[in-house]
Amino acid sequence: PRLRGMRDDAKRLVLKTPPLFCASAAEPALRGTPRTILLDVPCSGLGTLARHPDLRTLRTPGQVAGLVDLQRRILDAVWSYLPSGGHLAYITCTMNPAENEGQIDAFLARTPGASLEKQWQSTPDAFGSDLMYGAMLKKA
């Protein structure tokens, strides 16, 4: 559904649609060498509490720790497909620092040649919806 939405948005905005596909990030079946990868990682979803208040009681610390580990593995796996000079956009819908800034800081510390170009976190009133986090990484 998200990929379809991206295609529809690109068409509506009269933008060239980039190559889009859905794959397991653990073993992405990439053809060619992508210059930019958008990584919308599985997360705790705590930025959606306004719409899903039950998450407050459904998410356990163990589940969140498992998601942080999964995010780490996905970042490491996908990074290897990026060419020198390529970009990786890392996106979550959580406000949990361990899944956001903490994840990116740890990635930068263990990954030579990775740099942070920009990061942002939406505020509750910025879009009138979910809290989102994003980081743009560049490979040297």
Residue ranges and their predicted role:
Residues P1-A140:
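S-adenosylmethionine
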